[in-house]
């Protein structure tokens, strides 16, 4: 079996899936207390890194995704699959789990 080198550019989401780079979580509280990893809230904001071709409709046509690469999005807290690539955290989720585009 050949080794596969995973990078953001080699990840191609299928269907209506979206690949998101997770924004860094807060390292300190407002009072200046450093938080250990176990106490940090899971981030819900990230930047779209890759977009799938869209949902396949019953008639065989594709529904174009509403987000684009580079969009900053707010997504459901426990949605998707967490993936770590090159020290960065990503989440792969369905487009329906994206709640809003943040401007």
From Swiss-Prot:
Record keyword Secreted present: no
Keyword NAD: no
Subcellular location: Cytoplasm
Any one Gene Ontology BP term: chaperone cofactor-dependent protein refolding
Example of a GO cellular component annotation carried by this entry: cytoplasm
MF-aspect GO terms: ATP binding; metal ion binding; protein folding chaperone; protein-folding chaperone binding; unfolded protein binding
UniProt entry keywords in alphabetical sequence: Chaperone, Cytoplasm
InterPro entries for this protein: Chaperonin_GroES, Chaperonin_GroES_sf, Chaprnonin_Cpn10_CS, GroES-like_sf
CDD domains xref list: cpn10
Family: Belongs to the GroES chaperonin family.
Function: Together with the chaperonin GroEL, plays an essential role in assisting protein folding. The GroEL-GroES system forms a nano-cage that allows encapsulation of the non-native substrate proteins and provides a physical environment optimized to promote and accelerate protein folding. GroES binds to the apical surface of the GroEL ring, thereby capping the opening of the GroEL channel.
Complex formation: Heptamer of 7 subunits arranged in a ring. Interacts with the chaperonin GroEL.
Name used for this protein in its record: Co-chaperonin GroES
UniProt gene name: groES
């Amino acid at each position: 079996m050949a080794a596969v080198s995973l990078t953001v550019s080699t990840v191609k989401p299928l269907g209506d899936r979206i690949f998101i780079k997770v924004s860094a979580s807060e390292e300190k509280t407002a009072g200046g207390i450093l938080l250990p990893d176990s106490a940090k809230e899971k981030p819900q904001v990230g930047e779209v890194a890759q977009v799938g071709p869209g949902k396949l409709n019953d008639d065989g046509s594709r529904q174009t995704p509403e987000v684009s690469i580079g969009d900053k999005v707010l997504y459901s807290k426990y949605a998707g699959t967490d993936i770590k690539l090159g020290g960065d955290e990503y989440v792969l989720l369905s487009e329906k789990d994206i709640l809003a585009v943040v401007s």
